[in-house]
């Protein structure tokens, strides 16, 4: 994607998961037009990669790979939105969520300043505590009994990651933000099994690098106002989070 237009990716990501009239877009029509621009832009890039030599970027890999080179328009657009939203929205909200969590738990911030090596374990704890996507829907492929309930083949099932990540039967003191938990990666934010997020290790690496650089450069990232949350039952994130940097 052209570097000069990279801000469009975050804009399209915000629009894809937003409801008109709450700060991102004013109407369903304006939302539709901006997403059409997104689809048109990537369709042109797809054709450009298709006609050129294989390259190392993700779009080129999809165009030339046996499993993805013959995607239908619907499949292409579905993968596109998944990559745009999953590739930046969740990470951005986890960064903001980490800042907020540390401010709400100053003792944990003190731990981090005393021992920046705790970043490795703090990253999955941020992802659990924030849970940037609240839920995901699946279709049952067979009848099953679960929790004294019958789920029929073809039923739509909503899995509330945000609930599982606060399950006291599995996670000790689940509502607390603790950066040195013994098993910090015991969470559901990335899904599970064949549907587990393909970019989970990349997301963890991005957050790790961000916090390594933050701790090198600044003593304190202070939240100085109330966060404004995204109006969504799907994305658990922030429109704004005012902070003050203290060197």
Feature-to-residue mapping (PLM):
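Cytochrome P450
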Residues: 1-247
């Amino acid at each position: 994607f052209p570097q000069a237009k990279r801000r469009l990716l975050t804009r399209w990501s915000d629009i894809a998961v937003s409801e008109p009239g709450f700060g991102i877009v004013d109407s369903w029509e304006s939302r539709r037009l901006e997403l059409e621009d997104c689809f048109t832009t990537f369709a042109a890039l797809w054709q450009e990669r298709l006609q050129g030599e294989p390259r190392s970027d993700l779009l080129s890999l999809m165009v030339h790979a046996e499993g993805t080179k013959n995607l239908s328009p619907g499949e292409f657009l579905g993968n596109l939105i998944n990559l745009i939203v999953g590739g930046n929205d969740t990470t951005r909200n986890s960064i903001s969520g980490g800042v907020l969590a540390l401010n709400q738990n100053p003792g944990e911030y003190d731990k981090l300043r005393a021992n920046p090596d705790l970043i490795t374990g703090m990253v999955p704890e941020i992802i659990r505590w924030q849970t940037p996507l609240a839920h995901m829907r699946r279709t049952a492929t067979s009848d099953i009994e679960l929790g004294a309930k019958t789920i029929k083949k073809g039923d739509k099932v909503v899995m509330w990651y945000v609930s599982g990540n606060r399950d006291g039967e599995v996670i000790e003191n689940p509502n607390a933000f603790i950066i040195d938990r013994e098993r910090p990666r015991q969470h559901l934010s990335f899904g599970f099994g064949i549907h587990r997020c393909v970019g989970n290790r990349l997301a963890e690496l991005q957050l790790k690098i961000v916090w390594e650089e933050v701790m090198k450069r600044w003593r304190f990232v202070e939240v100085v106002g109330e966060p404004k949350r995204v109006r969504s039952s799907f994305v658990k994130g922030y429109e704004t989070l005012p902070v003050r940097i203290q060197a």
